[in-house]
């Protein structure tokens, strides 16, 4: 009788541990993505989801997770991966098609030489990202219409949401972030961000575990957005020195109290008058300025935002 060694027996303890941690991470990412999809009704029965694949870690992870969830979703929906080849110098045109064929997922490669347009318009050494992003967005909206996609899925994660919020706060004077779901300016497309609850550190680890064929994001040679980089460093520093702080700021984006801010469009301060009816949460005129304690730590993203816990079981989409 011939004995065959099992695959598990061939692994070293270090490899077995890495595999265990990777599988645990995959389950956590699937859980957080499912929660975001359910909380914001991102994907519905019959949807055709266009996953925008750039070749970076975030979009690879998004496609991988959605394909996994599609197999056990309680309803049917389609996925099509789309990459925009902008003719950046050195871009390897074969990597994504080969990867997607191996996955067996429907895909479309859209080739548009936006690189030449951007380099012609933007002076050398200046940041090209803003114009490039606008051109890319318009092309992807057109492709979504041509493909009959009902949802456009982007790979922005928790740190992107926080970074955009702080950029608008510090440099734009606005409390404005990056929503998990929006309708495009022309009113024709729904854009979703299923990784909204996922920190970037998890996506870095997941890319290493899955060995995605990452395509560098600096092929265009554009100057990196220094303000965004600075904000990113600030968030990373918080995570090191003050665990839980960045999660508390993130949670605050879904715990807005308009009556305790200053936006007259959100709350009628001008018409505010006594009603004779007690408001337990309304009188803070003589309170201390100390914030309410929040005992949630780095894992508080797994808790439903305040006010949404009741009845959540009835609304939640369950992927078995």
Curated annotation (Swiss-Prot):
CDD domains: TtcA-like. Pathway: tRNA modification. Keywords: 4Fe-4S, ATP-binding, Cytoplasm, Iron, Iron-sulfur, Magnesium, Metal-binding, Nucleotide-binding, RNA-binding, Transferase, tRNA processing, tRNA-binding. It is an enzyme of class 2 (transferase). Disulfide bonds: none annotated. A motif (PP-loop motif) lies at residues 54-59. GO terms for molecular function: 4 iron, 4 sulfur cluster binding; ATP binding; magnesium ion binding; sulfurtransferase activity; tRNA binding. Its cofactor is Mg(2+); [4Fe-4S] cluster. GO terms for biological process: tRNA thio-modification. Binds 1 [4Fe-4S] cluster per subunit. The cluster is chelated by three Cys residues, the fourth Fe has a free coordination site that may bind a sulfur atom transferred from the persulfide of IscS. Its EC number is 2.8.1.-. Homodimer. Belongs to the TtcA family. Catalyzes the ATP-dependent 2-thiolation of cytidine in position 32 of tRNA, to form 2-thiocytidine (s(2)C32). The sulfur atoms are provided by the cysteine/cysteine desulfurase (IscS) system. This is tRNA-cytidine(32) 2-sulfurtransferase. It comes from Bordetella pertussis (strain Tohama I / ATCC BAA-589 / NCTC 13251).
